[in-house]
Curated annotation (Swiss-Prot):
Gene designation per UniProt: selU
Rhodanese domain sequence ranges: 14-137
Subunit structure: Monomer.
Name under which the protein is recorded: tRNA 2-selenouridine synthase
Gene3D superfamilies found in the cross-reference section: Rhodanese-like domain
SUPFAM superfamilies, A to Z: Rhodanese/Cell cycle control phosphatase (SSF52821)
Keyword presence, Transferase: yes
Length: 364
């Protein structure tokens, strides 16, 4: 059976989104996994812990014997069924464990005995992880253009429309502000970095890439932080600033944070619970900046938010949200962004409305 073991092989796996059957324990998978991986563990968390303790106390032979004892009979049959189904569903896939050691080899052998020959990743997740880290360091050396602008300027959409754009917020599953959470939970830091590396590799492989187009982000996007190598390069990058009329920005924010989020919550949870989740989402976002707003201003805006939600529930109209959104932008978000932009004014190379910035970026 052909095994993958070169740097180019590892990169090819990430670029192709090759399905990976990851047989590590769930706790390991949650700490970090590759984008196209599915977790079908050889041992669950408790079994892995027991084998690990046995290894420390009695050595490798005893640990291996315990592992075979724990994963036997009906448990082994159930897991074999899952592995076999995954292999048949993903004939171009590959097995993976932590370091390409006993776990993936055991599963590979059991599958072979069942009539399925399936390759494994030599070096395992650790080798793929090192490839992802190295690829990000290497690809981050290419020139970068950042898209800046106040909240509601359509920066993310502009990045998404560029063939050399990488949507950092989309990969992080967070839009970067107090109201930035999405319905998808954020990945672990390692999984986010792996996903980013794979996206950069795929984007680079599709074209003769001369530069990256990224959104002007802070170091943190929700609970994820940008890799230091990329963040350092972004601090040196040229910035194109979108300066759209205030009314256009309000329309975008209404669509994104009120209409779309309400739709997404009700689609995920049903009308009643979805409405409660939507209300909690908006209140949580406002509460996150309570200290910066000051208690009195926060209470005023929170009351206006409650009124707007009542209006939206009874009439379907989101217009009432302008009563708290407009002052929030003018008193908090816009001054904050302008202050941040002033500190890097020498990096600004172009300013214009959304369409003008889009044309300028494509010409670079």
């Amino acid at each position: 059976m052909q095994e993958r073991h070169t740097e180019q092989d590892y990169r090819a796996l990430l670029i192709a989104d090759t399905p990976i059957i990851d047989v590590r324990a769930p706790i390991e998978f949650e700490q970090g996994a590759m984008p196209a991986a599915i977790n079908l563990p050889l041992m669950d968390n408790d079994e892995r812990a027991a084998v690990g303790t046995c290894y420390k106390q009695q050595g490798s032979d005893a640990a291996l014997a315990l592992g075979h004892k724990l994963v036997a009979g009906e448990i082994r049959q159930q897991r074999m069924y899952a592995w076999r189904a995954a292999c048949l569903q993903n004939p171009q896939g590959i097995l993976c464990c932590a370091r390409g050691g006993q776990r993936s080899h055991i599963v590979q052998r059991w599958l072979h005995e069942a009539g399925i020959d399936y390759p494994l990743v030599e070096g395992g997740y650790k080798a793929l992880r090192q490839t992802a880290i190295q690829a990000t360091i290497e690809l981050a050396q290419k020139p970068i253009v950042l898209i800046g602008g106040c909240t509601g300027s359509g920066k993310t959409l502009l990045v998404q429309q560029q063939p050399n754009g990488v949507d950092l917020e989309g990969l992080a599953r967070h839009r970067g502000s107090a109201f930035g959470r999405t319905l998808q939970p954020q990945l672990s830091q390692a999984s986010f970095e792996n996903l980013l590396a794979a996206e950069m590799l795929k984007t680079d492989a599709r074209q003769d890439l001369r530069l990256w187009v990224l959104e002007d982000e802070s170091r943190m996007i929700g609970s994820n932080h940008l890799p230091e190598c990329l963040r350092e390069r972004m601090t040196q990058a040229a910035i194109a600033v979108v300066e759209d009329p205030f009314e256009i920005r309000l329309e975008r924010l209404n669509e994104e944070y009120f209409l779309r989020m309400h739709h997404d919550f009700t689609h995920a949870y049903g009308d009643e619970q979805g409405w409660q989740e939507y209300c909690e989402y908006l209140h949580h976002g406002l509460s996150a900046i309570k200290r910066r707003l000051g208690l009195q201003r926060y209470n005023e805006l929170a009351a206006q938010l409650d009124t707007a939600l009542t209006t939206q529930l009874t009439t379907g109209s989101t217009d009432g949200h302008l009563a708290w959104l407009v002052p929030l932008l003018k008193e908090y978000y816009d001054p904050m962004y302008r202050y941040q932009l002033e500190k890097k004014a020498e990096k600004v190379v172009f300013r214009g409305e959304w369409a003008e910035v889009a044309v300028w970026v494509k010409a670079q």
